[in-house]
Every structure is written in C-alpha cells, then in structure tokens.
Amino acid sequence: MKKAVILLSGGMDSAVVTAIAQSQGFMVHALSIRYGQRHTSELDAAVRIARALNVVAHKVVDVDLRSIGGSALTDDIEIPDAGGEGIPVTYVPARNTIMLSLALGWAEVIGAADIFCGVNAVDYSGYPDCRPQFITAFETLANLATKVGVEGTQLHVHAPLQFLSKAEIVHEGLLHGVDFGLTVSCYRADVDGRACGRCDACKLRVAGFADAGVVDPTRYMELPCSLLLL
C-alpha cells in the first residue's frame, strides 16, 4: 500500500481529509503540530481522531511559533467575534508553509510521495495560505527541494476539500464515517474541548452543519445565535 502524510490538526476538515486518504487506500501517517497555540484542545482532538480512524502512525511535533508571534492564536491578542476587512488577526504567519514543510520532511523519511491537508478556499477566513495558488506552489517547491524529487519521484500535495463548502465537507465526512463529535474547531475552546460559539471558526462550523441539515455535535459554552433561532 502507498504511504501518505496527513496534517491532522484535530479540526473537522483535517479529520475528513484523514478519512478520505484512508478510503483511497493510503497507509495514513498523521502529523499534528504543537506550535504554541493558546489551547491544546484541538491537539487532544487530533489524538482521539487518530485513534478512532486507526491510522498507521501519529506524530506530534513541537514548533515554537509563539516566540515569533504575530497572531491572535499564539499571542495575548483578543480574538474577535466577527471577521473584519483583510487578513484576520487569527492568521498565523507562515504556519501552513511550516506545517507542510514538516510533513514533507517526514514523507521523505518514510518513503511517502503524497501529502494531504485540509485547507479550504471556499468557506475560509481570508488566509493567504489556504489559496489554491499556495498549494500548487508548495507542490512545485516539494519536487524541487527534496532528494526524492530530484531523483525522479513525483511528490503530490492533495487538498481534497479545497473547493467544497462547509456543508459539503460535513456530508463528505459522514460518507466516510467521521465522528464530528471528536473534533474541535473553536479558536477559544476550553480545556474540556467546549467551543465558545462566537468566534469565526465556530460560526463557519455552525453554518456548515445547518446548511447540511445535520445536527452539530459540538459542545458550546455559549449557544450560537443561529442555533437559538432554530
């Protein structure tokens, strides 16, 4: 069987991508990054998801992006309830570039030619490293900057959710048996994994489940207004 490295954050998108890679016959090696994010609930979720999906291997790597700063997800900056104009303060400088680079390194070591990530260009918050152009550019880099690429192995970076709406991602996950109750999407999740119900990530998740006509299994500290209207 072919091997693949999947970036598994613990959120719903990366959980769905992990299940998709498995359905395509890949031996899944899941990679999670402890980068200095303000809460560890998402990483705890990644461990639960990896166990539930019975991946071949799950590695958690430490990278201290908090020492660089520049994001509300790593710094002591208030996380807004609503997104503003331009790139939001929850953007983490170079995060996806660094994470994909680590995935690329592990892929080289284990002999995997495929990397999967859950970036999305439809229901996303304006992050530049979620755009299709970024994924295409990184795949080019991967084949230029690695020993295996130079020696002739074609490396592929897959973003199967890139052009799906959040509702479509929900349906895709259910089709592949993903337990969304294990996942954490919230920027402000507490130690028990309960979501705030107010941040941009929560709003996207709530809207996705509502549009899909599926009950959201998330435990919310504060019930989102859209759910109160149902």
From Swiss-Prot:
InterPro entries: QueC (IPR018317), Rossmann-like_a/b/a_fold (IPR014729). Its cofactor is Zn(2+). It comes from Xylella fastidiosa (strain Temecula1 / ATCC 700964). Zn(2+) binds at C186, C196, C199, C202. The gene is queC. Keywords: ATP-binding, Ligase, Metal-binding, Nucleotide-binding, Queuosine biosynthesis, Zinc. It catalyses: 7-carboxy-7-deazaguanine + NH4(+) + ATP = 7-cyano-7-deazaguanine + ADP + phosphate + H2O + H(+). ATP binds at L8, S9, G10, G11, M12, D13, S14, A15, V16, V17, T18. It comes from the Bacteria. Binds 1 zinc ion per subunit. GO terms for molecular function: ATP binding; ligase activity, forming carbon-nitrogen bonds; zinc ion binding. Catalyzes the ATP-dependent conversion of 7-carboxy-7-deazaguanine (CDG) to 7-cyano-7-deazaguanine (preQ(0)). Belongs to the QueC family. Coiled coil: none annotated. Pathway: Purine metabolism; 7-cyano-7-deazaguanine biosynthesis. GO terms for biological process: queuosine biosynthetic process. This is 7-cyano-7-deazaguanine synthase. The keyword Protein biosynthesis does not apply. Its EC number is 6.3.4.20.
